[in-house]
């Protein structure tokens, strides 16, 4: 299938070639600093959902389809999404580029490595871990950090169960007690959340410097800035902070940038990407993780309160018949079967999410994501 060159996609938003860093023919990073003076004038549409099921309800697919629909109506529309993590891509969840005709492309490249942002977050996170242990080693028992209090683990962008709990420091030359630690997935890193909340490199460095890594022997907190890790970590993230521009199958511009999980962080793409999209397009569709009680709630409570992104002008609450049946008590294996009583019972869940959105006073619609078996 032929896609538009990313230069053509950028031109749709008024982004000049000099402010693009090309990653092949269909991907590019945008120098967001060149557009910092443009205020976000567009209307933001947030896509959320009822309580998710193991099958997923299709928020990403709905968001992509809505942005394409706005483009077909002649509106200047843009899409903002999170980057896929390799862990879920190779796990039961799969990729995060939509499906069918509602898809962002180039699909394989977005799902696998993309522009290297997640690897940069991995490097920055693990640099801090290495500097923590280095400080403990060279300071000795009387140093700044009490090795028994270190809270900072390591990360990698993969589901590797064997590394969730490990013991480090068993080398006889390591000047500290061996301790139990582990590896988290990169998308769950505090660095990922920080990258997606930062407004620029200066703000990024300040936020990275505030990361708590452990305590002194007398209980005082020790931060990343105390071991001089903030500058080096920011240097590793200097390219990752720029949003990634791609497109949907129908050629609608899409910024895919950052990937914090909603259960342990705020669960939406970077503030920089959303703000840039709102300054260049009339309508911006974004997606928040999980349901209205988690991703949407955090969008209002965290993202909007930064002052960098306005509150949504409208919301879409995604539902499915299989989710209604699931929350009506039907087992996963029996979801394909017709069960009107279970659908009716499942409306209690949907009704609660409707109440959640009403609290925020934002106009919304309920979207029924239809499947062939419905």
Please give the residue ranges for each predicted region.
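Flexible phosphate-sensing "switch/lid" loops adjacent to ATP/NTP-binding sites
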Residues: 1-374
């Amino acid at each position: 299938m032929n896609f538009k060159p990313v230069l053509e996609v950028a031109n749709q938003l008024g982004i000049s070639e000099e402010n693009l860093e090309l990653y092949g023919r269909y991907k590019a990073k945008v120098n967001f600093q060149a557009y910092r003076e443009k205020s976000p004038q567009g209307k933001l549409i947030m896509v959320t959902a009822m309580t998710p099921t193991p099958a997923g309800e299709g928020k990403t697919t709905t968001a992509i389809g809505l942005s394409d629909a706005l483009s077909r109506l002649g509106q200047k529309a843009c899409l903002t999404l999170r980057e896929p993590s390799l862990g879920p891509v190779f796990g039961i969840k799969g990729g995060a580029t939509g499906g069918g005709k509602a898809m962002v492309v180039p699909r394989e490249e977005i799902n696998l490595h993309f522009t290297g942002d997640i690897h940069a977050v991995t490097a920055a996170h693990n640099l801090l871990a290495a500097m923590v242990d280095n400080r403990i080693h060279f300071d000795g028992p009387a140093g700044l950090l009490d090795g028994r209090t270190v809270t900072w683990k390591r990360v990698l962008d993969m589901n590797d169960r064997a590394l969730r709990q490990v013991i480090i420091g068993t080398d006889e030359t390591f000047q500290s007690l061996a301790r139990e630690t582990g590896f988290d997935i990169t998308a769950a890193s505090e660095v990922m959340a920080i990258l997606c909340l930062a407004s620029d490199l200066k703000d990024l460095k300040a936020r990275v410097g505030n990361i708590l890594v452990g305590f002194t022997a007398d209980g005082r907190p020790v931060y990343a800035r105390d071991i001089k890790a903030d500058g080096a970590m920011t240097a590793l993230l200097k390219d990752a902070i720029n949003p990634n521009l791609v497109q949907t199958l129908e050629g609608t511009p899409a910024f895919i940038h950052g990937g914090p999980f909603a259960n342990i962080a705020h669960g939406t793409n970077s503030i920089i990407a959303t703000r840039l999209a709102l300054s260049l397009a009339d309508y911006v569709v974004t997606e928040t993780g999980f349901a209205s009680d988690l991703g949407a709630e955090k969008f209002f409570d965290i993202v909007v309160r930064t002052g960098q992104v306005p509150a949504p002008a409208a919301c879409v609450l995604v539902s499915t018949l299989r989710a209604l049946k699931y929350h009506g008590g039907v087992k996963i294996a029996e979801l394909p079967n017709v069960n009107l009583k279970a659908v009716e019972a499942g409306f209690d869940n949907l009704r609660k999410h409707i109440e959640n959105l009403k609290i925020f006073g934002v106009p919304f619609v309920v979207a029924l994501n239809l499947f062939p078996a419905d």
